[in-house]
Structure formats: structure tokens, C-alpha cells
Amino acid sequence: MPERYAALLLVGAGGFVGATARFLVALVLPFIGTGFPFGTLAVNLAGCFLIGFISQLSVSSSLVSPELRLLLATGFCGGFTTFSSYMYEIMSLLRDGEIFYSTLYLLGSIVGGILCLYFGMQLAKLWA
């Protein structure tokens, strides 16, 4: 099997397991009576921890191969939460001394995300 297809299968399998895990966490930790999304917060924080742990092991040891990193960091964490990848990319920019770009990415994603969400909702209202 060509390497690209194997990588695609690893990411897909990890994503399936990650998305399933996210769904299960949402069942166990719903809005615990307060209206606060504890399940989403737990998933986002756990995903940040996992992608940091996996990425560091892949750099500083031979415990995590490139294939295992694809399965766990890109696949599982990507299916579990995209927030972890976002935080890792910001940290990578900061580590590389790219303060301007890390700040632009951080604020641009938050403000841009909120604006895109709003405009998407408004467009959907026109069609509904």
C-alpha cells in the first residue's frame, strides 16, 4: 500500500476513535445543571494535553513513530478536538519567535471564528 494511503487510513482510524470518544464524553459530562459546557471544556483541555504529550515524545524519544503520531495526534486528537491542534500551532509559532504571527493566529481565529459563525447563522436564517 502506498505510504499516502497508509497515512490516510491511520488518520481516519484515529479520527473515528477520537470523535467517538468525544461523543462519549459529551454523554457523561453534559451541561451539569449550570448551562456551562463542561464536556466541551474537558475535551478541549484533554486534547491540548494529549497533543502536547504525543508531539513532545515524537521529538524527544523514539517512543512515538511518525505513524503513531499521525494516528494519535492528527487522527485521534483531530477527531477528539481541533482546539488542541490550534493551541499546538500557536505554541509552535511562539517557540519559533513568531510573536506577531502567533498573536494574529490566536486573535484572528477567535474573532474570525465568531464572525464566521454569526454570518453563517444569518445566512441560514435567510434560507430557513
UniProtKB/Swiss-Prot annotation:
Regulation of its function: Na(+) is not transported, but it plays an essential structural role and its presence is essential for fluoride channel function.
Binding site for Na(+): 78, 81
CC terms in the record's Gene Ontology section: plasma membrane
Catalytic activity: fluoride(in) = fluoride(out)
Keywords from the UniProt entry: Cell inner membrane, Cell membrane, Ion channel, Ion transport, Membrane, Metal-binding, Sodium, Transmembrane, Transmembrane helix, Transport
Subcellular location: Cell inner membrane
Any GO BP: cellular detoxification of fluoride
InterPro entries: FluC
Transmembrane segments: 1-21, 45-65, 70-90, 99-119
One MF term in the entry's GO annotations: metal ion binding
Entry keyword annotation includes Signal: no
Membrane topology: Multi-pass membrane protein
One family name in Pfam for this protein: CRCB
Role, per record: Fluoride-specific ion channel. Important for reducing fluoride concentration in the cell, thus reducing its toxicity.
Family of the protein in this entry: Belongs to the fluoride channel Fluc/FEX (TC 1.A.43) family.
NCBIfam families: crcB
Full protein name: Fluoride-specific ion channel FluC
Species for this entry: Chlorobium phaeobacteroides (strain BS1)
Lineage: Bacteria, Pseudomonadati, Chlorobiota, Chlorobiia, Chlorobiales
